[in-house]
Amino acid sequence: MTPTRKDHILAIDCGTQSVRSLVFDPRGQLIHKVRVPIKPYFSPKPGWAEQHPSYFWDNVCGACQTLWRERPDLRSTIVGVALTAQRATMVNLDAQGVPLRPAIVWLDQRQTEGTEPVGGLWGLLFRLAGMRDTVRYLQMEAEANWLRTHQPEIWDRTQKYLFLSGYLTHKMVGRYVDSVGCQVGYVPFDYKHLDWAKPSDWKWQAVPMEQEMLPELVPPTEILGTITARASEETGIPSGLPLVAAAADKACEVIGAGCVEPDIACLSYGTTATVNVTSRRYVEVIPLIPPYPSAVPQAYNLEIQIYRGYWMVSWFRREFGHREELLARDQDCVPEDLFEQLIEPVPPGSMGLILQPYWSPGLKDPGPEAKGAIIGFGDVHTRAHIYSAILEGLAYALREGLEQTEKRLHVSTNELRVSGGGSQSDAALQITADIFNLPVSRPHTYETAGLGAAMDAAVGLGLHADFTTAVTEMTRISRTFEPRPETHEIYDALYKRVYKQMYDRLRPLYEEIRNITGYPPK
């Protein structure tokens, strides 16, 4: 049916694996979408992850132009545009707005040694609080510190230092402006007050830069600008349409899954697996690790993440799933569908195989010495048990994170919503329900990040009065997985008596491995 009303929203989702252009109506119905796969990064050196900023923009343009070719009737129905993008991918621009080097993608692992410690009163306070190592780690991780140390000629020419969202926004509206909801990374941002840090804040010492290098910030739901004639020519988006501030991809997933109240937690089963709770109160679950800006104005996402989350499914597929990859080609399906069949006979607990999913080190708990572990092997175990243990281990880790969050926030969770690629797995969602002992719901659309961005636009443009209305009108549950009491009993015992003991018991061994092998580097 050809749309006649001008009340549709174009959401652009620039993720890690693909760029999507999506058209939603005010009911949250996905009218049409185009997905363009992208190469996440290239690696000039081991551990580096970079991509040309123009590559992202070209694929945004391609996704939009393909959308208009496939559905030319939709172009005249668009009332506004919203953008969501991967977090913590950094772009350096010169005085003409031209990228000076490839973007450093969030998956990059380089670190900077020898940064100047935070001094003065802040340095004394961190020393007294035992937080110096945490601040040092943040300094080592900051891309700006690496650029200033190793590519000073680039840093000296940098006029604007932007997240990918800020770069794409500039390409669309011609202004150096970005959403508050996209500020997730190593820049001098005040996460409590949702603005650039005050001049006296320690972050300007930890990551030195001029504030003029950073964009103007606009809260979610407010207008970033209007689509320029040049952007219209390149994307096909009608010029003059408003670009409404949304948020980073994880934040948009949270509201797209309907999680705007603290008793409904959002699990994101993506490359990085996270558990998020939306709160109007600023609470640091881990000291000095702030909650991130929500896609809801003046709210926060309390987030615990497993850096190598459902990346582990890709790891299993690459290392152990060759048979399923071949069969999937013959059966015209994806290997993950066959993995579901593979683990059907595996009992809860994977016959004693327990996995700790720290394939990448952490900051506090797990710490920088952490490694992944699988314990409990016997001669009965097969690939199927390993795959099942991956799904269980990720759910154990996220349950531990949610329990930390509940303790700090003094709120009990009543329901879980799941987004991300892993949300399409019935096995993963049933395991999650059984481990958490909570109902786990799959939203009506897989495109929760794009939907969340569209919800920001819908509220900002007055299609819905507020987020309570937007959630009611635009989000729905497709299927709910209820916990099974007898299965939860097994998982609960394994979680409390085995999984939660693993890290503290293995930590000294991880430290010895690190001392002997030098990996992960100190």
Region spans (language model):
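Phosphate/pyrophosphate-binding loops at sites that engage ATP/ADP/AMP, CoA/4′-phosphopantetheine
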Residues: 60-79, 151-155, 200-210, 233-235, ...
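A polyampholytic, Gly/Pro-enriched intrinsically disordered region
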Residues: 55-56, 120-136, 236-237, 264-266, ...
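Active-site nucleophile and cofactor-binding loops and adjacent substrate-binding regions
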Residues: 28, 51, 79-85, 104-107, ...
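Conserved phosphate-binding catalytic cores of ATP/NTP-utilizing and phosphoryl-transfer enzymes
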Residues: 1-5, 228-237, 247-264
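N-terminal phosphate-binding loop and adjacent alpha-helix
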Residues: 34-76
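Glycine/Thr-rich phosphate-binding loops that ligate phosphate moieties of nucleotide
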Residues: 1-36, 42, 79-117, 153, ...
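Short glycine-aspartate micro-motif
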Residues: 9-13, 21, 77-83, 161, ...
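Gly/Ser/Thr-rich active-site cleft segment
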Residues: 14-16, 27, 127-248, 313, ...
